[in-house]
């Protein structure tokens, strides 16, 4: 394997898959079409329900059939999602598009990290994963920041054109996926390369049994999965509901890019700085990151307009630091043959919490008439997780 070429392809795929022109304005776009925050929260819940159902199966598919194939299929589903959303006439169609988007995201999550780690491992350079992941993370956040600038085009693109432009970008992701090579670390992976579907039923049974055994015998991985799920809750919900809060504070939709742009910039800076950190234990790091994250959510939900800018910056900055080190420890603790599956379990735990959290936060906002009320409740939950973190026995 040509490792530099492989990593370049991974970076291109990471960048284009995160260059979403609608993420900074999709709530405002749907609200402008007459959807309530509770309905939008329901659509988001459909996204996470689909993620919950498909997260682990997609990880299993990546481990048994190939990570490169998973990434290519993800881009195809993303294209279908954007086209469906572009021409969605009602809430049912919006929910269908969100389900397709969730399916695309599950095909990426776990798969991209596993492919990157094992690509390095084939060259005996897995100790460089932290640096490689940091570069990928910076590119992803740069793409997110650039995508948020698309809100400036809200008067030009309108609803359908936003999503059709997304579909064109996703086609570039598909091309990048097709240039990747499948990393073969173990004998099982080499055998799979010859015939991915050979003895698939027997391999699936063994894979599920062995993956469950890893979770039983690696308590660190279980603790990391739990911590990741809790601290991740504000990641998207803050971005989502700050959009409508800024609108209620008098902001024009064309300026909604400012908040996610600043948040992405903060995340990029903190990711670069976090590479220089070498925490001996993750417990104090989690407590610090959760305190900063929860405080940022409270600021975004209860503060003035500037709080809607600073709050998401604190959220994304703290999450960038936490996940850079948490994923390094998690990858070190799990085997290559089960890597995508177990990372998918980590992501599934997040979806389990997001299914009730998303519509509940929207409902709190609708009932109270305050767009930031749900965010305040969420911020309190994250702060509580930091303050009540149990001691390791």
Give the location of each predicted region.
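Juxtamembrane intracellular "pre-TM" segments in multi-pass secondary transporters
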Residues: 1-4, 181-226
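Helix-loop boundary and gating motifs at the non-cytosolic
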Residues: 1-53, 217-261
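Cytoplasmic helix-loop-helix junction between adjacent transmembrane helices
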Residues: 99-141
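Helix-loop junctions on the cytosolic side of multi-pass membrane transporters
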Residues: 166-195, 389-393
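C-terminal transmembrane bundle of multi-pass solute transporters/carriers
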Residues: 44, 240-393
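Conserved MFS/SLC helix-loop-helix module at the cytosolic interface between two early adjacent transmembrane helices
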Residues: 52-89
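Helix-loop junctions at membrane interfaces in 12-TM secondary transporters
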Residues: 4-7, 86-98, 299-312
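Hydrophobic core of transmembrane alpha-helices in multi-pass small-molecule transporters
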Residues: 15, 81, 92-108, 307-322
